[in-house]
Amino acid sequence: MAKVKMKTNRTAAKRLKITATGKVKYTKGGVSHYNTKKSSKRKRQGRKPQYVPKNLEHKVKALLPNDV
């Protein structure tokens, strides 16, 4: 009988990317609308890519078994 493959979590695949060095990168949410009350600093920091902390990386990588 064939081995059952792990399915990729599509929610995670759409939001996260594994970099060449193995870090997990994502984009910060909450900067697309309702921006008038947010400071320039807060909006600027929202454009920068964010990285998943090292202690949670293994959990996230389990959701992305095929490195989507």
From Swiss-Prot:
Residues 35-47 have a biased composition (Basic residues). Keywords: Ribonucleoprotein, Ribosomal protein. GO terms for cellular component: cytosolic large ribosomal subunit. The keyword Ribosomal protein applies. The keyword Ribonucleoprotein applies. Residues 29-68 are annotated as: Disordered. Pfam families: Ribosomal_L35p (PF01632). It comes from the Bacteria. One of its GO terms (biological process) is translation. One of its GO terms (molecular function) is structural constituent of ribosome. Gene3D superfamilies: 4.10.410.60. Belongs to the bacterial ribosomal protein bL35 family. This is Large ribosomal subunit protein bL35. The gene is rpmI.
